[in-house]
Amino acid sequence: MTDPQQPYFDVIVVGAGNAALCAALAAREQGASVAVLEKAPASEQGGNCPYTGGGFRFVHNGIGDLRPLLPDLTDDEAGRIEMAPYTSDDFRNHLTTVTHGDTRTDLMDTLIAQSRPTIDWMTAQGVRWDIYSRLSAVVGAPSVIPNSVGLTAWESGPGLINMLTTSCRRAGISVLYETEMSGLTQDDSGVVVGVVARDSDETYRIRSKAVILACGGFEANAEMRGKHIGSGWELAKVRGSRHNTGDGHRAAMTIGAQPIGQWDGCHGTPIDIDAPATGDIQVTDQMPRRSYTLGISVNLEGKRFVDEGEGFAEQTFVSMGRAILRQENGIAIQIFDSKARPHLEGRYGGSQKFEADTISQLAEQIGVDAATLAATMDAYNEQAHDGEYHPRELDGRSTNDVKPPKSNWAIRIDKPPFSAFTVTGGITYTYGGLKIDTNSRVLDSGDSPIAGLYAAGEIVGGIFYHNSLRAAGLMHGAVFGKIAGEQAARI
């Protein structure tokens, strides 16, 4: 028997990011009373969403189809934009390719089919949009804008959280900040009937008909990173929220939820060694260091350890981050010569760089053995090629006889001054999570729904494997958040 003195809501949503707030709004729209439990203080609300650019990948028919969603876009701007349709087949092919075909087809099909309807629904909930790469739309005639990420939330990730939170307040949804979910409660038949909540004053129970877990991954939990992703990852700096510590994973699996997906996989990237230990909205986006394809990367012994030119950085930055974290202290040094410098990302301008006219002098500055670094450089240059860099082409110029090889952009590093940048690995979010069905119901080990329990967002496993697809994360969070809210409210 439940205690009538315990607070009650029809639906409890754990988390207050994109997926969680979409779930809360969808449940409220169905007439349910809703409480949102946010572990973070109000100033840090939103999980990883505030650290994103707010981009959404969805099916559309080109710029004409998007105009109703962009009331601030002038006719003149729209007339100078070329944007091809983004079809269901495009979306399916892209997601299948980056996940090596491992993504769950049932979730993928639901994501794709519901992507545009969910964008329209979010618009009705008060979300405003901006055209992706809008600035380029006013300088060219016409401007060709990528079709795959057609829209971003107004004022990016922080703006999205602000808009969704405002809509929740207007809808009468209670948001309980600095309130942590420490466990799920069940009745005698195993139905989830609430949560154990903890704030600064007390631990107490909140009753409900349904609970939606939308509280992110476990990327900010060093112990879980080391256990599941592997040795070295406990050293990773966290690029997003410090509050995403796997609370939902642990609570759900304690009552029999089935784990699924690539638990040893995550989205990560090389970042500046001076990046903060956890996300900082002001600087996080300036920390990635992804021009490694144009030079060599060495560890603290002065030795290369990875194929820097295996592919474009957009395809390899996750594996590069993983490789760096396997090195001593999770540190690497990117080295370039003056031929490469004009091609480095602008973000390198915010780094502490080391610069010298000789490799020996550079080695002394970065604290590695000069003889070892010189031998590494000589072995590389002996097999490398003369010429200039063409960063947007896989040029095939390789050093196949050097171990490890460099498959592209193997240009001799021989024109001083030489520059070095110290980097480490940063983690954005994790891939492993809970198994759900297409109604966002959490499944047990026998693939049966756990009554009263739903999940959405990063906590869901089975969507991303090996790599992620830009702007698909926010989209799948919104799609399955909306579904979870609707389904939970109908119990």
Where are the language model's segments positioned?
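Beta1/beta-strand and adjacent pyrophosphate-binding region of the FAD-binding site
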Residues: 5-19
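Glycine-rich FAD pyrophosphate-binding loop
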Residues: 29-50
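Conserved redox-cofactor binding core of oxidoreductases
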Residues: 45, 60, 100, 104-203, ...
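N-terminal glycine-rich dinucleotide-binding loop that anchors FAD/FMN and/or NAD(P) in oxidoreductases
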Residues: 50-86
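Rossmann-like flavin
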Residues: 77-141, 358-379
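A glycine-rich dinucleotide-binding beta-alpha-beta segment and adjacent secondary-structure elements
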Residues: 183, 372-467
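An anion/pyrophosphate-binding glycine-rich loop and adjacent beta-alpha core
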Residues: 245, 249-372
